């Protein structure tokens, strides 16, 4: 049996852990601008290659603290193709609010600038509700653009805790292959077929850029002319291409994280999840290893990060201004 590593154990009791309450601001809202040297608000960023368990860890952290999750996967921002893009399911999310997940039409383009603006609005919205923002996703270039903006606004306003869920590449390669097979069993071929447009072979925009969509082009255009044996052979080649492209993506994502840590000197806490994946044939053993090696240590890291300095953010409802700004940004992304 193939265990889905990103599945959160919603129904199992969690070990005792701190619950974060943001205290009221010491100086009042009008004094914040007059106290630029005061404590910053806190943001957790979870990074990692595709398939390493980022979503699972984000939910684990969010259910142990008062937190909400902000997606940083530029493909998952779009609506549709939930299997192909491996979006977190309602069951897996355990009731934790997720932002910027499936909010744009499939054909909409999302630039790094668009994403940064939307992410900043989401962070403000989460903080205004007295919650901890957790940014999670595989689009490291967008995360870099958000955190290291040219004006240094992000780092001047927020303290960041960077967690990197890492898996040894040979082990991850095997898991990625199994995950693609599992996606096929879950209906990936049928899902892509519903989106496929014989009159349009442009895969450079929107959700059609997702790995697992353009690879099917030759299959759908030729399957009606093939016998059963040739059809299965072609499908097998398509799936192998998807597996290869997914693993190559994982390698690039890992290289980008290494660059951020070594070249740009980001303080990134690496969490090795390799032993979890080597135990994936036994769900119980894998879950125990996950808690001991990944979720538990990450919870401790976040606890120390949050208890370092109290947040300056008062407990207030999200402002209508933030909500309106988000609506405007979503509308801008719809412009072709």
UniProtKB/Swiss-Prot annotation:
<feature type="transit peptide" description="Chloroplast">
    <location>
        <begin position="1"/>
        <end position="55"/>
    </location>
</feature>
<keyword id="KW-0934">Plastid</keyword>
<feature type="lipid moiety-binding region" description="S-farnesyl cysteine">
    <location>
        <position position="333"/>
    </location>
</feature>
<feature type="modified residue" description="Cysteine methyl ester">
    <location>
        <position position="333"/>
    </location>
</feature>
<dbReference type="GO" id="GO:0009824">
    <property type="term" value="F:AMP dimethylallyltransferase activity"/>
</dbReference>
<keyword id="KW-0067">ATP-binding</keyword>
<dbReference type="GO" id="GO:0031965">
    <property type="term" value="C:nuclear membrane"/>
</dbReference>
<dbReference type="GO" id="GO:0009691">
    <property type="term" value="P:cytokinin biosynthetic process"/>
</dbReference>
<keyword id="KW-0808">Transferase</keyword>
<dbReference type="Pfam" id="PF01715">
    <property type="entry name" value="IPPT"/>
</dbReference>
<keyword id="KW-0636">Prenylation</keyword>
<dbReference type="InterPro" id="IPR027417">
    <property type="entry name" value="P-loop_NTPase"/>
</dbReference>
<feature type="binding site">
    <location>
        <begin position="48"/>
        <end position="55"/>
    </location>
    <ligand>
        <name>ATP</name>
    </ligand>
</feature>
<dbReference type="GO" id="GO:0005524">
    <property type="term" value="F:ATP binding"/>
</dbReference>
<keyword id="KW-0488">Methylation</keyword>
<feature type="propeptide" description="Removed in mature form">
    <location>
        <begin position="334"/>
        <end position="336"/>
    </location>
</feature>
<dbReference type="GO" id="GO:0009507">
    <property type="term" value="C:chloroplast"/>
</dbReference>
<comment type="function">
    <text>Involved in cytokinin biosynthesis. Catalyzes the transfer of an isopentenyl group from dimethylallyl diphosphate (DMAPP) to ATP and ADP.</text>
</comment>
<protein>
    <recommendedName>
        <fullName>Adenylate isopentenyltransferase 3, chloroplastic</fullName>
        <ecNumber>2.5.1.112</ecNumber>
    </recommendedName>
</protein>
<keyword id="KW-0539">Nucleus</keyword>
<comment type="similarity">
    <text>Belongs to the IPP transferase family.</text>
</comment>
<dbReference type="GO" id="GO:0005634">
    <property type="term" value="C:nucleus"/>
</dbReference>
<keyword id="KW-0963">Cytoplasm</keyword>
<keyword id="KW-0547">Nucleotide-binding</keyword>
<dbReference type="GO" id="GO:0052622">
    <property type="term" value="F:ATP/ADP dimethylallyltransferase activity"/>
</dbReference>
<keyword id="KW-0203">Cytokinin biosynthesis</keyword>
<keyword id="KW-0449">Lipoprotein</keyword>
<dbReference type="InterPro" id="IPR039657">
    <property type="entry name" value="Dimethylallyltransferase"/>
</dbReference>
<keyword id="KW-0809">Transit peptide</keyword>
<dbReference type="GO" id="GO:0009536">
    <property type="term" value="C:plastid"/>
</dbReference>
<keyword id="KW-0472">Membrane</keyword>
<keyword id="KW-0150">Chloroplast</keyword>
């Amino acid at each position: 049996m193939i265990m889905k590593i990103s599945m959160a154990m919603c129904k199992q009791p969690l070990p005792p852990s701190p619950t974060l309450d943001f205290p009221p601001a010491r100086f009042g809202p009008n004094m914040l601008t007059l106290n630029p040297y005061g404590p910053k608000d806190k943001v957790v960023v979870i990074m990692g290659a595709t398939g390493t368990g980022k979503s699972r860890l984000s939910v684990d952290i969010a259910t142990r603290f008062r937190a909400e999750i902000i997606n940083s996967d530029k493909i998952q921002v779009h609506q549709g193709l939930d299997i192909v893009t491996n979006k977190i399911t309602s069951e897996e999310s355990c009731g934790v609010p997720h932002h910027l997940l499936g909010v744009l039409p499939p054909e909409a383009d999302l630039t790094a600038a668009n994403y940064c603006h939307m992410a900043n609005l989401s962070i403000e919205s989460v903080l205004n509700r007295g919650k901890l923002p957790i940014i999670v996703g595989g689009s490291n270039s967008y995360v870099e653009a958000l955190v290291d903006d040219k004006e240094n606004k992000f780092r001047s306003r927020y303290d960041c805790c960077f967690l990197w869920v890492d898996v040894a590449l040979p082990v991850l390669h095997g898991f990625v292959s199994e995950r693609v097979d599992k996606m096929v069993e879950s209906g990936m071929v049928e899902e892509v077929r519903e989106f496929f447009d014989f009159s349009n072979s442009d895969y450079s925009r929107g959700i059609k850029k997702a790995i697992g969509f353009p690879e099917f082009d030759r299959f759908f255009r030729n399957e009606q002319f093939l016998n059963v044996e040739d059809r299965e052979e072609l499908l097998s080649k398509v799936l192998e291409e998807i597996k290869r492209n997914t693993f190559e993506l994982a390698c690039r994502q890992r290289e980008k994280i290494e660059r951020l840590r070594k070249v740009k000197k980001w303080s990134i806490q690496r969490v090795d999840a390799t032993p979890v994946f080597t135990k994936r044939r036994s769900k119980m053993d894998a879950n125990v290893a996950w808690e001991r090696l990944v979720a538990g240590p990450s919870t401790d890291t976040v606890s120390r990060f949050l208890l370092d300095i109290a947040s300056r953010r008062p407990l207030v409802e999200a402002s209508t201004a933030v909500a309106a700004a988000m609506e405007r940004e979503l509308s801008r992304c719809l412009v072709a």
